[in-house]
């Protein structure tokens, strides 16, 4: 035994001496240098010419490092470590200082990185940091980013970073100056290049960073980190490649969480533009990107004209960039655009509309555009533009102008310019009689009916069955009936055995299914066309069928009409046949036949139009017969898939008028050349449009079952609807009411082979819109026979809903069963008890405040996760009992909870602040068999800025436990 102890003592002495020697060794500059070089060669691969200092405070000089095709160099790197933090939960670096950092992006790095660098699925655990790492102060005198196309310099950068779990939190960041310049061209005043020369050189550059190429090689990846930027302020931004060096001041507050970039504040200040913006960018799992930005812009050069606008953009999986810009301050100016990013010539279409756009030329001189319409479409090097507007100058008559032209990267050609003054017309006010006002002051919509609905959800299978739809509506004094049934399954399948829409004597019938494959059959029988279209008379029958799948639809239709008459245009008979089959090869045909047509004073005896086309050949025939005019044309054509050229010829030309006859020889050729498009691209676009349509249908389907996605649940209810809306001419909807009633609602959920059932005998929801105020009342009765037990009563009002949006509401839960919590969690095996609560809502719709007072009695919970919830009150024990799976029970005889929630604003930043006060005198927890712990507790949990404060006590029979935890993070 003594020998054993002797060996142990010698081993302890040996390791103690070794530790002291190793500690003294790394404390010295020489020792730290050897240790750093040894570990660096094995793990990091960083090269440093000079190393000084020790492990607590060291400096690296002339650093070189290559990662992911990016070359990083720096003159020096100085790091200071807080040694006391090594004995705490967080590791703190007091200071990190760099000098002259250069990041060089090599050629083809973007494509190589997208293909090889990241795995298809990234687990969050790879980037999970259990214990926080804090970089307290980071200072860089200069950071230079270079690429084959651009150079960006950041001067005097000051920031801080906190790494915890999957979160990266940036402290308020300051950048003194940002310089942006081109890496290819030097636009100095001494050497100004010709514009055409620049464009030619630009066209010769290889498109290394083509956005379409980069996005097309991407697989679905989720970014596993959440990034929070409290604030970023840039004192000056300078673009040094241009003749006028514009200076900008930029301030930014943003964060990235769950693939959503939330921009809380973006402020740009310059001599020519001042802008405040906020919004968000969503990176979807299918690699599409959605963006919504709201901005307020002030233009000093236009006498501080203030403009509020909203930008909505979407980059979808078909590489189409769709955007919409709306500004109400510019009198409803709208800009809609579509850009195809998967083609080298970038086809696009942009449309601008504005009414009464005004611009201040001088302080008391205004330039107005009464009606402004613009179109820009084509390709980046071959586009067409059209501008039509009416503009006025002060004291001058309005002038109409029409400009059309085309252009490319080098030139702009004007094809047509027309302008002429418009004669002024005097407008007289029309007297509106009271009966006319009453006509427009009626309810535009009245809806009443009943719906039976049942549903079921079992993990990944969901059903909603509506066996009875019985709705009756009155739209602008026109009656509408909706009768039928609907079946919905698993987010991607909708089927109806039949739905009838009755509009007066007109009937629309729908039958079929919509899913991965769809079969939709519809028919229209309209004998009363003027029911919705005044002055339109006649009869019409139609059948339209959609068959196939998402990519290759088959569409067929047959439309027959008789005695159509509208505004001096009369058709005796019309027949339209259509057949389209987009399979591996496109084919389509259409036939239009009409006879005895009266077009004002012109009479047409017969009109016959027929077309047929596929991927390679096309045929078009046109026949018109009348007393004064006879036209017969037959054109055959073919597309060349390789060149994109179309070649056609007239098989027949015969035109006869009262002046004489015009004929031509056969095989008169016509050609169309377009180097930017081919018929193959056209059909690919058609297929992509079908994909977009299918994707739209899928996104429209509601995610109603997401809340119950983990376990089996079903519901059944009978719902009645009564609604009406009133519209005053020239104003918004002024009055309206919606009443919903439900009877015998049954909820059923299966957890761990055990079934939970809850019945709601009756619920009633009424919503009223009276002028600018929205008011609603809610009544939910679990047991209709018990007047005061197991009920929910309340109201929610929004005052001045179009402007101030102030909210006021109150909900009362009276002796409601606590077992309802089983429908929101799967962790509890058994729950019982009752609670009653009063919840008040106030504030505004955008800044709501909540006050909830909850009283509970005889609460019993059985679960194997109770210890996990209890440890939430002790942050240092988090995660220590996660693997304990035993039967645990908690009983609370009586207690109350007070919950408050309100928005918090500080230094122009917004956050949510909430507080929970818990108080119970009799609590017992059964942890192990025959081990019961009894205690009382009074706790207060406060949340603000992602941090928690917990203050209170837990009182046991033998001892008293005081809690005072502040600024901790779950």
UniProtKB/Swiss-Prot annotation:
Keywords: Membrane, Transmembrane, Transmembrane helix
Topological type in the membrane: Single-pass membrane protein
Stretches that traverse the bilayer: 12-32
Any single GO CC term annotated in Swiss-Prot or TrEMBL for this entry: plasma membrane
Gene Ontology terms describing biological process: protein secretion
UniProt subcellular location: Membrane
PANTHER family: TRANSLOCATION AND ASSEMBLY MODULE SUBUNIT TAMB
Recorded family membership: To E.coli YtfN.
Protein's name in the database: Uncharacterized protein BU087
Protein's organism: Buchnera aphidicola subsp. Acyrthosiphon pisum (strain APS) (Acyrthosiphon pisum symbiotic bacterium)
Lineage of origin: Bacteria, Pseudomonadati, Pseudomonadota, Gammaproteobacteria, Enterobacterales
């Amino acid at each position: 035994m003594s020998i054993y102890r002797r060996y142990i003592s010698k081993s302890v002495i040996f390791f103690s001496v070794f530790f002291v020697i190793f500690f003294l060794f790394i404390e010295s500059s020489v020792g730290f240098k050897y240790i750093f070089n040894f570990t660096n060669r094995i793990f990091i691969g960083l090269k440093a010419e000079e190393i000084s200092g020790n492990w607590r405070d060291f400096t690296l000089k002339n650093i070189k490092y290559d990662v992911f095709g990016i070359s990083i160099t720096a003159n020096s790197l100085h790091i200071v470590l807080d040694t006391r933090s090594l004995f705490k939960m967080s590791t703190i670096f007091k200071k990190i200082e760099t000098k002259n950092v250069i990041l060089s992006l090599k050629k083809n790095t973007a494509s190589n990185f997208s293909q090889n660098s990241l795995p298809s699925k990234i687990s969050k655990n790879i980037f999970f940091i259990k214990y926080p790492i804090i970089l307290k102060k980071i200072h860089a005198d200069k950071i230079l980013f270079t690429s084959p196309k651009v150079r960006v310099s950041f001067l005097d950068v000051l920031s801080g970073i906190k790494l915890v779990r999957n979160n990266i939190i940036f402290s308020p960041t300051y950048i003194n100056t940002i310089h942006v310049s081109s890496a290819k061209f030097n636009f100095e005043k001494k050497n100004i290049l010709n514009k055409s020369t620049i464009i030619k050189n630009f066209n010769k550059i290889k498109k290394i960073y083509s956005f379409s190429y980069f996005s097309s090689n991407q697989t679905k990846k989720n970014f596993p980190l959440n990034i929070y930027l409290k604030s970023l302020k840039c004192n000056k931004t300078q673009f040094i490649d241009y003749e006028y060096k514009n200076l900008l001041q930029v301030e930014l507050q943003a964060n990235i969480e769950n693939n959503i970039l939330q921009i809380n504040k973006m402020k740009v200040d310059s001599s020519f533009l001042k802008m405040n913006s906020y919004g968000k960018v969503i990176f979807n799992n299918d690699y599409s990107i959605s963006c919504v930005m709201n901005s307020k812009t002030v233009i000093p050069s236009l006498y501080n004209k203030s403009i509020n606008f909203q930008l909505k953009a979407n980059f979808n999986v078909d590489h189409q960039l769709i955007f919409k810009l709306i500004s109400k301050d510019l009198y409803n100016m709208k800009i809609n655009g579509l850009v195809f990013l998967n083609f080298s010539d970038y086809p696009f279409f942009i449309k601008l509309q504005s009414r009464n756009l005004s611009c201040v030329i001088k302080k008391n001189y205004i330039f107005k555009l009464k009606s402004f319409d613009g179109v820009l479409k084509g390709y980046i090097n071959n586009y067409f533009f059209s501008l039509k507007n009416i503009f006025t100058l002060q004291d001058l008559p309005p002038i109409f102008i029409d400009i059309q032209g085309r252009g490319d990267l080098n030139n702009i050609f004007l094809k047509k310019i027309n302008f002429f003054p418009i004669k002024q017309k005097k407008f007289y006010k029309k007297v509106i009689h009271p009966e006319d006002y009453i006509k427009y002051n009626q309810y535009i919509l009245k809806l009443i009916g009943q719906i039976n609905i049942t549903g079921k959800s079992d993990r990944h299978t969901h059903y909603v069955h509506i066996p009875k739809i019985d709705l009756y509506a009155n739209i602008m004094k026109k009656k509408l009936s909706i009768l039928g049934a609907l079946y919905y399954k698993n987010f991607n399948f909708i089927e109806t055995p039949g739905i009838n829409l009755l509009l007066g004597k007109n009937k629309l019938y729908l039958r079929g299914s919509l899913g991965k494959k769809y079969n939709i059959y519809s028919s229209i029988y309209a004998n009363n066309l003027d029911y919705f279209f005044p002055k339109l008379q006649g009869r019409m029958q139609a059948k339209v069928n959609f068959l196939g799948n998402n990519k290759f639809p088959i569409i067929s239709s047959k439309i027959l009409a008789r005695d159509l008459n509208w505004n001096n245009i009369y058709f005796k008979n019309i027949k339209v046949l259509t057949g389209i089959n987009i399979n591996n090869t496109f084919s389509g045909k259409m036939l239009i036949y009409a006879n005895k047509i009266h077009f004002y004073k012109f009479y047409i005896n017969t009109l016959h139009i027929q077309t047929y086309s596929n991927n390679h050949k096309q045929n078009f025939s046109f026949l018109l017969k009348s007393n004064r005019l006879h036209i017969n044309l037959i054109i055959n054509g073919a597309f060349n898939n390789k060149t994109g050229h179309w070649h056609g010829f007239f098989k027949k030309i015969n035109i006869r008028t009262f002046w004489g006859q015009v004929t031509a020889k056969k095989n008169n050729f016509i050609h169309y050349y377009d180097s930017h498009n081919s018929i193959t691209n056209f059909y690919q676009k058609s297929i992509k449009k079908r994909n977009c349509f299918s994707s739209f249908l899928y996104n429209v389907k509601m995610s109603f079952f997401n809340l119950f996605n983990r376990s089996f649940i079903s519901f059944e209810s009978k719902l009645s609807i009564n609604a009406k809306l009133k519209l005053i001419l020239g104003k918004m909807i002024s009055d309206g009411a919606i009443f919903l009633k439900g009877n015998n609602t049954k909820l059923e959920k299966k957890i761990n082979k055990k079934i939970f059932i809850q019945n709601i005998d009756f619920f009633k929801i009424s919503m009223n819109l009276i002028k600018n105020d929205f008011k609603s009342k809610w009544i939910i009765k679990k047991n209709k026979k018990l007047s005061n037990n197991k009920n929910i009563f309340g109201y929610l009002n929004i005052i001045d809903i179009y402007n101030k949006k102030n909210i006021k509401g109150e909900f009362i839960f009276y002796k409601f069963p606590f077992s309802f919590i089983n429908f929101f969690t799967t962790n509890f095996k058994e729950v019982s008890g009752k609670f009653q609560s009063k919840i008040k809502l106030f504030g505004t719709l955008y800044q709501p405040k909540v006050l909830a007072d909850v009283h509970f009695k005889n609460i019993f919970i059985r679960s194997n996760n109770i210890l996990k919830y209890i440890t939430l009150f002790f942050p240092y024990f988090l995660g220590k009992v996660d693997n304990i799976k035993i039967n645990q029970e908690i009983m609370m005889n009586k207690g109350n909870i007070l919950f408050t929630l309100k928005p918090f604003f500080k230094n122009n930043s917004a956050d949510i602040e909430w507080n929970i006060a818990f108080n119970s005198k009799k609590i017992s927890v059964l942890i192990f068999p025959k081990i019961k712990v009894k205690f009382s507790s009074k706790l207060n949990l406060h949340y603000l800025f992602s941090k928690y404060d917990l203050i209170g006590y837990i009182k046991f029979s033998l001892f008293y436990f005081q809690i005072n935890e502040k600024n901790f993070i779950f």
